Amino acid sequence: KVSDSAYSNSCSNSQSQRSGSSKSRLSGSHSSGSSGYGGKPSTQASSSDMIIKRNKDKSRKKKKNKGAGQGAGQAQTLISASTSLEGRDEEKPRPSGTGCVEQQICRELQDQQHGEDHSEPQAAEQLQQEEDQSGSESEADRVEGVAKSEAVQSFPIPSPLSVTIVPPSMGGCGGVGHAAGLDSGLAKFDKTWEAGPGKLESMTGVGAAAAGTGQRGERVKEDSFCCVISMHDGIVLYTTPSITDVLGYPRDMWLGRSFIDFVHLKDRATFASQITTGIPIAESRGSVPKDAKSTFCVMLRRYRGLKSGGFGVIGRPVSYEPFRLGLTFREAPEEARPDNYMVSNGTNMLLVICATPIKSSYKVPDEILSQKSPKFAIRHTATGIISHVDSAAVSALGYLPQDLIGRSIMDFYHHEDLSVMKETYETVMKKGQTAGASFCSKPYRFLIQNGCYVLLETEWTSFVNPWSRKLEFVVGHHRVFQGPKQCNVFEAAPTCKLKISEEAQSRNTRIKEDIVKRLAETVSRPSDTVKQEVSRRCQALASFMETLMDEVSRADLKEGSGGSGSSGNFTTASNIHMSSVTNTSIAGTGGTGTGTGTGTGTGTGTGTGTGTGTGTGTGTGTGTGTGTGTGNGTNSGTTSSSRGGSAAAPPVTLTESLLNK
């Protein structure tokens, strides 16, 4: 009875075998060639062997063709599904396991055949319904099955075996006609994968989610994505589905490829330096994720698919977008192996990268920003070379930090604002005398990446070496006051340069050189300035005292109304005696007379006239003076002195005596 049912089935479905055995089976056996992995034929030896065996059996007996056709169709379905999930982890072929799977499948098929004898009409009707359902199934439902099968996979590197994926609706048991329908379904599924990168972009994106069973809503696009990289060889092991929304790549396109291939050439050195510095930190801190983080900015390549740019992919230039990468080093979980082989430390380290796109800070041209706009810092040396740039400057200026470091900051100032910057740096040098002093300068224009200028307000601080008194670096905390004319700061700058006359260029060059020379000068100490100020004030005070004493002495001389005579000064040891003779005239005021004399001993001088004055001095020398005063009448006054044999001392002024004391 079993053979009769099989014979009737084979007779009724012989036409479907002839029509679909050549073309549909060929497309089904080479489904991996159209899946995006270079068009290589499938490496599944088991499925191809089963197809060849079925062709041989068909030429011999139709009776055996029934069982062989069922076994081949079901084996191709299940083996391809199993190898798609397990083939990525296999590094060596396992033919014995595949044979066991085939034997088990054949035994299950034979058991099912006994149950189909009593329900052959119902099975045929059910088979027809399944074929109709598979023929009318939408493309999004098949993609949903692909996504479910991929969700089971963990971190393995993809292989060509994993490409031959059978949608869930094409599974199940059936006859030879169902095997032909399965081959045609695989051919349709290959056409789905052959639809190009434009179709692949929508498979893991919003389109696949919205075209599902209707129970799930449209997925919200994410602004960032994450990926896991093996530190052993730099291969990408896992990416989040949001990479399609951010960069346009299909989710699986990064798997098995080096991450640095997607980084811009100018940023690869920065990426490598961050990795080399981050690994020792992770090892020293025990690879704790929260303690081994670092952040930097790079340019990542965007996908050139048919959906984003249409045809002619080769002729279009490669576009890059700025991203802020957060690095976290982790150790991969240990895997149990049958040979009890333990992985050494360091070989199982993983790198988790979270990439966030950086957008421009400006919405409209020439935008006036508020006082609450974020600040960013730029530090440069005394020679004007930029040594540090804050990552917050990327969205405001369009430059990555590595693009500015090592360049002269003078090249970014507007040529009409160089005179303002010269005054600013003069103030920087003056404020450098006091540690921690800061000031705000006038607004000035700064060149950004797209060739436009922004208006900056800056708070300046500086650091002076306390030993050499040389300026080490200048820090500017900038805030954008007015935005550029072009909102997108990441666009390429125009090739044409601003035309400036030769005279203006020479003047600008001279101003830049003057600024650099001024920054190279020695900064005076605050104590030296105080000493100079005190010394200047002391000199002014001494000059004032001398002038005051001169005025006092002149006032004393003008108090008499007649002639006056002054005697010399006599010094004995440390005592100073002054004698003066004043003559008074009745008729008028007399003049003054002076005289000098030398001698030793003691002498007294007396002047006679209308009035008398007496002066007595004792010392080693005697001075003699004669004064004559005239008015309406004539009066004379004389002073006599005695002379001795000793030498007279030089006269001493009042100011000198005060200074001597």
Curated annotation (Swiss-Prot):
Name where it's found: Nucleus; Cytoplasm, Perinuclear region
The short motif Nuclear localization signal is annotated over: 53-66
Q: Name one GO molecular function term.
A: transcription cis-regulatory region binding
Q: Where is the composition biased (Basic residues)?
A: 53-66
Q: What is the effect of changing residue 85 to M?
A: In clone SE-P4
**What's the subunit arrangement here?**
Forms a heterodimer with timeless (TIM); the complex then translocates into the nucleus.
What is this protein identified as? Period circadian protein
Source species, please? Drosophila sechellia
